[in-house]
Amino acid sequence: MLTITAINAFNDNYIWVLRQDSQQAVYVVDPGDANVVLDYLHAQRLSLAGILITHHHRDHTGGIAALTDHVKQTTGHDLAVYGPQSEDIQGINQPIEPTLSDSLTLPFIDAPVRILSVPGHTAGHIAYLVDDALFCGDTLFSAGCGRLFEGTPSQMWQSLSLLAALPDETRVYCAHEYTLSNLKFAQTVDTDNEALNAYVEEASTLRAQGKATIPSTIGLERAINPFLRPLSPTIVNSIKNQFCDQDLTKADELTCFTLLRQWKDIF
């Protein structure tokens, strides 16, 4: 059984820890802060087997150097650091090119790890799928999606469509606790979505109790995330009201997604 644990970092980052059964060697996803990872490993008496990186932003990669140095000093071994080959990330020694390989095998992890190319937030962003656990970095959030810093709306829409096609039960381990903020926007554009309104109550209760709203699931996101359902009649009507100068008579999914993302950027 694969156990997944969150380490809180900075204001709202999650660093995910992957542990197979009772193995003492674990993997971490997007360790932006080495100190919180080392504290966790020490407290749990665990060792670090490797690092999985989704994209190059500093709050996801800032801990690589200190963690690799720690492992080298304490074990004499080089720590395996996986990440997208196309992004300039210092410390990656196991570069991944999704067009050449769509999976990898990790020591101490039973299931193969599927690699998904999900450009949009950054040009070379990748995601990792381990059994039914999706580690998607800053591509898909609960009730939202990442900003387009480097990619195009078309790339992000294709990436989100790829993730939305995964089974309903797929658990979504994104890298930030942005849920309540995203839900405010979702309720603004999708005013009569009963599933969304119910989830707002659930998520608000969780956060009031100091609990995470992550992981979400693909099934839930398809029901409540406006960026996965831009042609919903209510959402299209909201877009028309916001962008009065746009002719949306024959609008397709990409057009509506693009306008939604522009709206969210200034929300």
Curated annotation (Swiss-Prot):
Annotated Zn(2+) 1 binding sites: H55, H57, H121, D138
Keywords: Hydrolase, Metal-binding, Zinc
Disulfide partners: none
Cofactor: Zn(2+)
Catalytic activity: an S-(2-hydroxyacyl)glutathione + H2O = a 2-hydroxy carboxylate + glutathione + H(+)
Enzyme superclass (EC): hydrolase
GO molecular function annotations of the record: hydroxyacylglutathione hydrolase activity; metal ion binding
Record carries keyword Metal-binding: yes
Domain of life: Bacteria
Pathway annotation from the record: Secondary metabolite metabolism; methylglyoxal degradation; (R)-lactate from methylglyoxal: step 2/2
Binding site for Zn(2+) 2: D59, H60, D138, H176
Entries under PANTHER family matching the protein: HYDROXYACYLGLUTATHIONE HYDROLASE, HYDROXYACYLGLUTATHIONE HYDROLASE GLOB
Known role: Thiolesterase that catalyzes the hydrolysis of S-D-lactoyl-glutathione to form glutathione and D-lactic acid.
Record note on quaternary structure: Monomer.
Similarity section: Belongs to the metallo-beta-lactamase superfamily. Glyoxalase II family.
Protein name: Hydroxyacylglutathione hydrolase
Species of origin: Shewanella sp. (strain ANA-3)
